[in-house]
C-alpha cells in the first residue's frame, strides 16, 4: 500500500470560501446536505452552495491525471479498468482517449451523473452502490480506481467496498477527503455535504489495513 499523488493539483486549483458555505442563508448546511445526498441535478450542476455548481467536461483537465495513471500502473496491452463511484466519468473518458483498446467499466448511484457522462463511453456505465458486492469475478480488472466516493460511506459499509476493490482488481487506487490538523478538519466539516466518514490520515490508514485493502491511496485536503 503506497501513497501516490494524482489529484491534489486539480483539487487545489479551486478556491473555496468555507465560512460562506456553512453560513449561506439560502442554503443552510442541513438543507444543502439533504439536496446534495439526492445525487441529482443539484449535486452536480445546481447552486454552488449545494456542491459542484456545474461539473462540466473541460478538455485537458483530466488528461494529465490519465497519463500519469497509465504510466504508473504499467497497464497491459488490452487493459480493463473499473471506476467505483465514477460520476460523470471524465477520467475514464480521458483514459480511453489515451488507450483506445482500453476496456472500461464504471458505476455510480447518480442517474444524473451517468446520464451526463461523455456519450462515447456511456454504454460502459451503470447504476450500482459502492457498498454492495460488485458483479465481477476475482481479479477481473487490471486496475480499480475510486475518486472521492468512499468517504460518503459509513464505517460498516467501507468494509464491503474496500474488500470488493481488493477482490476484483489486480491493482487499486482510492482517493478520499481527509485532514492533517485542526484547521483542515474545520474546513472539511464546513465544506463537505455528503461525507459520512470524517477521518484523519492515520485513521484512514488503519481502516485500509483493518479491512484488508492493499492498493494505493491518496488524500485531498481543505487548506
Stretches found by the model and what they are:
Residues 1-73, 77-137, 153-167, 171-223:
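Class I (Rossmann-like) S-adenosyl-L-methionine-dependent methyltransferase catalytic domain
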Residues 145:
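A conserved beta-strand element that flanks and buttresses the S-adenosyl-L-methionine
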Residues 149:
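Hydrophobic adenine-recognition pocket in adenosine-nucleotide-binding enzymes
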